[in-house]
Amino acid sequence: SEPTMSTRVQQATSCVLLIIGCTNYAASKQQTENNAVCDTPCKCLGRLAVQKAYLEGALEHARQSIKAFASSSRQHTIAAGATNTKLSGHHPNQGRRGRRRSSSARPNNSKGNSPSKRAGGAVRGETPASGRLKAAKLLKSSNYETATFTPTEMTIQNRRACEQVDESKEYRFDELNFDKEQGIPTPALTLEISMGCQKNPGDTGGACDGTNADDGVVTKLTFTTAAPVAETSPLVAGAYKKTSKASLSISNRTEEGRVANSKAAHEAAKRLMAIKQPSDLSTYTDDSSFALLVGQLAMKPPLGAELTPALRDQVNKFITDNYGANEGDFRSKFLAKTEQAAVFYLDGKSKKTKKISELESKSELVTASGYAFFKGIHTEQAEKVENPRSQGNPETAENKKEGGNTAKPFCSTIQNQTECEGVKGTPPTGKAKVCGWIEGKCQDSSFLLSKQFALSVVSAAFAALLF
């Protein structure tokens, strides 16, 4: 029976790495003949028209998505690369492997490749607050289009070698002429895929910034004898990433809801960074987006959840406790400490340390904010408190010294908020109380210290971006 299109695509994917292209790609007549006799993809190994159509459809959503939040993505790409946080969850689909397009094979929206014309997964009726929450998620969500290259073994076919192949020559996808009689002439020859998101024209204009309709994903194929490598990188980085002996999988983000959410995140992020007076508390507290970001960082509601009245009260209390109740408190207690805080930033590939007040270039500010955000929100409680039942021993509890620090009471055993906040003793550095009523229970008040520090770095760096 006639193979299904899905079967054809899978067969073509498994076969495409077994072949090489000849330089006589100008022989359009031969390509046409190959397509005409394509009983099965593995027989003719070509059918470029079909492959290119799938290719353009698979990657059009990537171009659209990148354009939707390119400026924000560009600002956070380096910071994202500095973390161990998994930015993108990929679910490779065998039926979509091997689909890639060249710089000369731009998608044509008139052919139905636009995400707005695709069905499925639409998320509608979002409130403005929900849209602003996307700003927080943008920095650590799966909104990065990532090309994942998976190394695979190549099987050498006992077929006539293509005498015209130049092993170091680079080919565009549409230049390859897949000849059904040709296989890989040498086990050392590998297919190298290089991919990046580039400004028009092609690979000479730098990284995508979403300002040109022709910006998009660019793919190069090179036949080489280079050693196998495999990498994963955000396409928005601009720089090409290479792999060999590999197939290419692109995350499928064609649903309208993903595109809409990405646009909302982009707009929300721009509002968050539009801070005019970084030394004024009202600059932050008057912005509902900032409260949403605090809630996402400190209170950790489920992704996509709105701030309920109870949660909003907790957020407001957290802001008052950590940022100050008035302008004077904010400047003397919070801003002064923030400016003196030491943070990590990236200088090229090296991780370095500076005080926030000494960060100079926009790159330093962006990487510092991203590093603090990604690392800070995942930091566990740094120091465990001790059980107050050990107070009977003069060598423990309040009398016990370790490195000059007084041991703390076991806050989590206290069930009453008033009693919790009234515990006497030496509070953790930077905190007003020993214990705090946090997320509906009594906890060591240093519990949110790392989150507050991360938040302070993010706030200061965002503000400084404007200067």
From Swiss-Prot:
KW Cell membrane (keyword) present: yes
Keyword Coiled coil among record annotations: no
Topology of this chain in the membrane: Lipid-anchor; GPI-anchor
SUPFAM superfamilies: Variant surface glycoprotein (N-terminal domain) (SSF58087)
Annotated glycosylation sites: 108, 252, 416
Keywords: Cell membrane, Glycoprotein, GPI-anchor, Lipoprotein, Membrane, Trypanosomiasis
Subcellular location: Cell membrane
Region ranges (Disordered): 77-133, 382-407
Prodomain residues: 445-467
Any one Gene Ontology cellular component term annotated for this protein: plasma membrane
Top-level lineage group: Eukaryota
Residues carrying lipid (GPI-anchor amidated aspartate): 444
Stretches with biased composition (Polar residues): 77-87, 107-116
Compositional bias per record (Basic residues), positions renumbered to this chain: 93-103
Transmembrane feature ranges: none
Function as written in the Swiss-Prot or TrEMBL entry: VSG forms a coat on the surface of the parasite. The trypanosome evades the immune response of the host by expressing a series of antigenically distinct VSGs from an estimated 1000 VSG genes.
Entry protein name: Variant surface glycoprotein 7
Organism of derivation: Trypanosoma brucei rhodesiense
